[in-house]
């Protein structure tokens, strides 16, 4: 069915162009830019539309790998272990965000600041880990504000 539809306009073009070229030219330009190009491809254009564009998924894999190489340069990590580490970091960040949000609501403030994040870290992470995280976070914020 599609090839017949394409042949008929092709046959009509020479006859119509002889009659009114000025009327046909503006009508052809608009569909070519927007509608005619996908239709001319036929099945090929349909296949291209069916292909899904991959969503860019943000992961922490490259950062986990960089930290691993800083700590143990000679050790590798399997893809399954990397996936587990990525899930772990996502879970921790989720908990920190929820706790920081709760703290902001308790204090009736619309904004989560570094103070809420710091308190959330102290509440979510245990003991010595919280102390190290707070000191590293403070160092990072200081470096960011100074530059």
UniProtKB/Swiss-Prot annotation:
Gene3D superfamilies: Histone, subunit A. Keywords: Acetylation, Chromosome, DNA-binding, Isopeptide bond, Nucleosome core, Nucleus, Ubl conjugation. The keyword DNA-binding applies. InterPro entries: Histone-fold, Histone_H2A/H2B/H3, Histone_H2B, HISTONE_H2B_site. It is found in: Nucleus; Chromosome. GO terms for molecular function: DNA binding; protein heterodimerization activity; structural constituent of chromatin. Residues 1-31 have a biased composition (Basic and acidic residues). SUPFAM superfamilies: Histone-fold (SSF47113). There is a cross-link at residue 143 (Glycyl lysine isopeptide (Lys-Gly) (interchain with G-Cter in ubiquitin)). The modification N6-acetyllysine is found at residues 7, 35-36. Signal peptide: none annotated. It comes from the Eukaryota. One of its GO terms (cellular component) is nucleus. It holds the Pfam family Histone. Residues 1-55 are annotated as: Disordered. Belongs to the histone H2B family. Core component of nucleosome. Nucleosomes wrap and compact DNA into chromatin, limiting DNA accessibility to the cellular machineries which require DNA as a template. Histones thereby play a central role in transcription regulation, DNA repair, DNA replication and chromosomal stability. DNA accessibility is regulated via a complex set of post-translational modifications of histones, also called histone code, and nucleosome remodeling. This is Histone H2B. It comes from Gossypium hirsutum. The gene is HIS2B.
């Amino acid at each position: 069915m599609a090839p017949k539809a394409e042949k008929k306009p092709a046959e009509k073009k020479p006859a119509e162009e002889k009659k009114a070229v000025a009327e046909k030219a503006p009508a052809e330009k608009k569909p070519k830019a927007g509608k005619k190009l996908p239709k001319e491809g036929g099945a090929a254009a349909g296949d291209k539309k069916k292909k899904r564009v991959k969503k860019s998924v943000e992961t922490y894999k490259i950062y986990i790998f960089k930290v691993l190489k800083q700590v143990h340069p000679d050790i590798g990590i399997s893809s399954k272990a990397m996936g587990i580490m990525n899930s772990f970091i996502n879970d921790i960040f989720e908990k920190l965000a929820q706790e920081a949000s709760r703290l902001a609501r308790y204090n009736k403030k619309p904004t989560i600041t570094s103070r809420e994040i710091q308190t959330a870290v102290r509440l979510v992470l245990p003991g010595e880990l919280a102390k190290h995280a707070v000191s590293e976070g403070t160092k990072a914020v200081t470096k960011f504000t100074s530059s």
